[in-house]
Regions:
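Edge beta-strand at a domain terminus
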Residues: 80-88, 120-136
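N-terminal helix-cap/turn-to-beta initiation motif at the start of protein domains
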Residues: 26-43, 58-61, 81, 134
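Bacterial signal peptide processing site
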Residues: 21-24
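N-terminal glycine/threonine-rich, aromatic-flanked beta-hairpin/loop signature
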Residues: 52-90
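Sec-dependent N-terminal signal peptides
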Residues: 6-14
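Positively charged n-region of N-terminal signal peptides that target proteins for export
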Residues: 1-5
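C-terminal motif of bacterial Sec signal peptides marking the signal peptidase cleavage site
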Residues: 16-19
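An anionic, turn-rich surface loop/hairpin at beta-sheet edges
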Residues: 76, 81-85, 91-110, 115
Length: 136
């Protein structure tokens, strides 16, 4: 009888240890895309070379479409709107609007978007804080 009990405990131990080890390779799948309430309207004023600034309005929709409007301050009637679909990067924290010749990478954070440079890197320096759009 002791032998059967020993074998039973051994089998249970092996299965228990196996289930613990199988979780070791699990990857944390939490990212901005699936953890944040990212859909909505983001606004801010970004620097401009030929105007006092640019009023930026970016609407992100749950179906991965967007509407981006640039309205140049001190230049009435100089407004541009782009619409289309955006793509997520592999890690789910950066979107690309896919607009040629325009910065179209944005990093998602809690209730804000951080505009990235043309190559998808964070803008640094004195003006970096001006490239943040806040969620309305």
């Amino acid at each position: 009888m002791n032998r059967k009990a020993f074998i039973f405990i051994l089998v249970i131990g092996i299965f228990g240890l196996g289930s613990c080890l199988s979780n070791k390779g699990a990857v944390d799948s939490h990212n901005s895309r699936n953890s944040l309430d990212w859909a909505g309207v983001y606004t801010g004023i970004t620097p401009a070379a030929s105007a006092s600034g640019i009023n930026v309005r970016l609407q992100l929709n749950k179906d991965n479409t967007y509407e981006l409007t640039y309205d140049y301050i001190d230049r009435p009637g100089n407004s541009f709107t782009n619409t289309g679909s955006f793509k997520w990067n592999d890690t789910g924290d950066i979107i690309n609007l896919g607009i040629a010749d325009t910065p179209s990478y944005y990093k998602l954070a809690e209730n804000k978007l951080i505009q990235l440079d043309m190559s998808g890197k964070e803008i640094t320096g004195n003006l970096a804080d001006y490239y943040v759009l806040k969620k309305n």
